[in-house]
């Protein structure tokens, strides 16, 4: 029987890859950890946010609980990415993060269909939601989850 490695899913490693993919689509733009969390969530459940893509992570009735877990994963992943030099930090307006040159080089090596689709959706999600405040993103997410009964 083949044994799967479930530690790859919902892990710092997986979240780190998604953060780098997300940050790579908008060049040197800096985002807060909360913005990264919400944009990643929107990216994975894009259909629920009326973006013209299917949900990358399928249907999930526990999205609100997943969002809470995703926040802590985002912070752990950011720490790991910063220490490895894969993302840069700016502290002028609170802690904000952008992909580094090393991170861009790493992302260019990711050629899977998932990586390509994630980046396509990320560009659309960023265009639609990047100017929203953290509170506004939370309000939109809460509304969408309650509207969908999830």
Set out the residue ranges of the language-model regions.
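Accessory DNA-binding and partner-docking regions appended to nucleic-acid-acting proteins
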Residues: 67
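Short, amphipathic alpha-helical interaction segments positioned at domain boundaries
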Residues: 104-144
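Accessory beta->alpha helical hairpin/"wing" motif in late/C-terminal subdomains of nucleic-acid enzymes
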Residues: 89-113
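Generic structural signal for hydrophobic core residues of well-folded globular domains
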Residues: 23-26, 42-43, 81, 110, ...
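Short, amphipathic alpha-helical interface elements at domain boundaries
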Residues: 2-59, 63
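Eukaryotic partner-binding/assembly regions in large regulatory complexes
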Residues: 1-15, 73, 117-121, 143, ...
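Amphipathic alpha-helical interaction segments
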Residues: 46-50, 85-88, 110
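Basic amphipathic alpha-helical segments that dock to polyanions
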Residues: 75-84
């Amino acid at each position: 029987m083949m044994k799967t490695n479930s530690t790859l899913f919902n892990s710092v490693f997986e979240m780190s890859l998604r953060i780098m993919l997300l940050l790579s689509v908008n060049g040197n733009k800096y985002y807060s950890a909360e913005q990264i969390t919400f944009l990643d969530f929107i990216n994975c459940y894009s259909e629920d946010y009326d973006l013209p893509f299917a949900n990358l992570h399928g249907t999930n009735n526990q999205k609100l609980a997943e969002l809470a877990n995703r926040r802590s994963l985002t912070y752990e992943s950011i720490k790991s990415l910063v220490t490895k030099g894969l993302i840069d930090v700016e502290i002028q307006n609170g802690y904000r993060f952008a992909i580094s040159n090393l991170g861009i080089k790493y992302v260019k090596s990711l050629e899977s269909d998932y990586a390509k689709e994630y980046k396509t959706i990320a560009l659309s999600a960023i265009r639609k939601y990047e100017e929203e405040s953290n509170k506004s993103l939370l309000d939109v997410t809460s509304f969408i989850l309650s509207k969908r009964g999830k």
